[in-house]
């Protein structure tokens, strides 16, 4: 029997519950940990945190494992949320789940678990860790539709060396089947789709509490005024919904898409048609780079990259490195490259790391 001690981050969802179950079956000394990372506005209307805790507690009781509750709200605000707001103020569209993983789930949580005397932490992420000669690799989850390696690209060797992903080799349907077979109460619970630890509340309404509306004009690329926006920080490149404008006077009924933002002028730029050339770019610049092995990939080798979650891998090459930034060129133009989002580089199933997009080029 394996008596290594592992602390499992239990969110109340089916994935982390089955992760805890599998580790218990494998003989680990398992403790569950429920993270409370958001204090404000914890209302029944928007935040399911209370129900999530009850679900986690119910599963822990069934598995006969202890469940600890830890409040990381201070760390979350300082390490994740403040940067999240700063990026939006600058006109970029950040991915808080990436920061939440690297700073909270695999830093604050890991530090806490190690201080408790644990050997490992575990989560319900669809990803895998592989170790060869002391080098840890992050691999895609076996279920391509659920693979979450994109959100984990900022993890380092120390973090991966203490991490187990118990369901990374499974498909979602198999995870739910295991949960049903063991009569876990959350076997049919729907997946969370909200921002990490902020939940399912309407995003613009939430953001408005911290970044007040600043209305301005919506322009076409030839500076024809076609509408009014609520504040450029509320919109993202490629966005179609919520623009409030119809066809042009020339009669085109193609939908409008956000193609650019000018923070200084407070102007939102739009184009008509999903395949408009202004939405396609052949290369990007990324900064704040993070490579899992500690060493950058080779320049001008053929890799693959994702510029958003669940995107099909796009063949690419890293064409230039400079300080903490790089240029990535794609074999085919990419749609809707968005500053603030992450570009993540892969070699087959291995996630090499990536960076934050700061610009794009034709």
UniProtKB/Swiss-Prot annotation:
Compartments in which it is found: Cytoplasm
Catalytically driven reaction(s): S-sulfanyl-L-cysteinyl-[protein] + uridine(34) in tRNA + AH2 + ATP = 2-thiouridine(34) in tRNA + L-cysteinyl-[protein] + A + AMP + diphosphate + H(+)
Annotated catalytic residues: 100, 196
GO MF annotation, one: ATP binding
Region (Interaction with tRNA): 146-148, 308-309
Keyword Membrane appears in the UniProt entry: no
One GO cellular component, as annotated: cytoplasm
Protein's name according to its UniProt entry: tRNA-specific 2-thiouridylase MnmA
Organism: Nitrosomonas europaea (strain ATCC 19718 / CIP 103999 / KCTC 2705 / NBRC 14298)
